[in-house]
Design a protein with these regions (language model features):
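Intrinsically disordered, low-complexity acidic/Ser/Thr/Pro-rich linker and tail segments
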Residues: 1-25, 30-33, 37
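A structural motif specific to WD40 beta-propellers
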Residues: 9-11, 52-55, 94-97, 138-142, ...
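WD40/WD-repeat beta-propeller blade N-cap
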Residues: 14-21, 57-64, 99-106, 144-151, ...
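WD40-repeat beta-propellers
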Residues: 24, 43-46, 85-89, 109, ...
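Loop/turn segments within WD40 beta-propeller blades
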Residues: 24-31, 67-73, 79, 110-117, ...
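Conserved strand-to-loop turn within each blade of WD40 beta-propeller repeats
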Residues: 36-40, 72, 78-82, 121-125, ...
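Solenoidal tandem-repeat scaffolds enriched in leucines and small polar residues
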Residues: 103-183
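Blade-level signature of beta-propeller repeat domains, shared across WD40, Kelch, NHL, RCC1
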Residues: 291-318
Length: 318
């Protein structure tokens, strides 16, 4: 599926959240379902094909800032203002575990290890913590404190943990070798996503830029910018799609930008809002920010989560 066949048609609008949606992810495998986390302290499970709300998960006392789903779709983890990492059972909507220890809000989470046996979290307290999802211990099995500011993004690939921080650095922890590598971006990091090959990663920073970074050398392979693309205030999560041939990111004005990875050229600018304009607040209004995007490789669909409380699912039109 070449980049010029990128899906640009809104095929579903998922509503129900009362406040900005901060996190969106497809279920594992076929990606039949979508999980969302929002300012209203709720996690919701939707079937985008029917636009039906299937389940609401209520345990957070503060905003939900990130989500991750296990490979078997039986569990998911959520984090936010509670300073706690929640591990959920999907069918029963009950929490299996609650990991406490962070000193401030938890911004980001991921599964890792064989059989998704560990959880990784990053916090405003500047630490990355690794938790044993299988044991009953409440204490983290590892804590990394190298960041000089809030940890905004974590992801796991094999035995490596990628951690992006407001201090302008991406740190890659090799858990097998016991070493850390540091790439200096300069501007505050809001999002980190490794490529499928693992030899590079996409990073978003608060200078209205995305960059594709070479994993071994730390060199910038490609920069993605546009005169109309603004991201200087709010945390925006970007992603790669179409077999890593496109970079996708929301902006602070209610639109989504799609770049060709090889050339760095802008392919599409799409409006998250139905009326196709900036809405009430203009740029830098929380209501207009498209804070997260997610790609579904099998279905050739993707989703955008907005400050307007809606999630838009995009596909190929008839």
């Amino acid at each position: 599926m070449p980049a010029h066949n990128f899906p640009t048609t809104p095929i579903a609008r998922l509503t129900g959240h009362n406040g900005p949606v901060h996190a969106v992810t497809f279920s594992a495998g076929t990606g039949q379902y979508i999980l969302t986390g929002a300012q209203d302290r709720k996690v919701r499970l939707f079937n985008p094909a029917t636009q039906r709300l299937i389940q609401t998960y209520s345990a957070h006392g503060y905003e939900v800032l990130d989500l991750a789903v296990s490979e078997d779709n039986a569990r998911f983890t959520s984090v936010g203002g509670d300073k706690t990492v929640f591990l959920w059972d999907v069918p029963t909507a009950q929490t299996l575990r609650r990991f406490t220890g962070h000193a401030a809000r938890v911004n980001t989470c991921a599964f890792g290890g064989e059989g998704d046996s560990v959880l990784v979290s990053g916090s405003y307290d500047g630490t990355v913590r690794v938790w044993d999802a299988k044991s009953r211990s409440e204490r983290p099995i590892m804590t990394f404190s190298e960041a000089k500011d809030s940890v905004s993004a974590v992801c796991v690939r094999g035995h490596e943990v990628f951690a992006g921080s407001v201090d302008g650095r991406v740190r890659v922890y090799d858990l097998a070798m016991g070493v850390v590598e540091v790439d200096v971006l300069g501007a505050s990091v809001t999002s980190v996503v490794p490529t499928r090959a693992g030899d590079s990663y996409l990073v978003s920073t608060l200078d209205s830029s995305l960059r594709l970074m070479d994993r071994p050398s730390g060199k910038c392979l490609q920069t993605f910018r546009h005169d109309e693309f603004g991201n200087e205030t709010y945390r925006v999560r970007s992603t790669l799609g179409m077999a890593d041939s496109v970079a996708i990111s929301g902006g602070e004005d209610g639109s989504v930008f799609v770049w060709d990875v090889l050339s760095g050229k802008l392919l599409h600018r799409l409006w998250h809002k139905e009326d196709g304009d900036q809405g009430g607040g203009g740029r830098n209004s929380k209501k207009d920010v498209v804070s997260a995007v997610a790609w579904n490789q099998l279905r050739k669909q993707w989703a955008s989560a907005g400050g307007d409380g809606e999630v838009v699912v995009w596909g190929v039109g008839d």
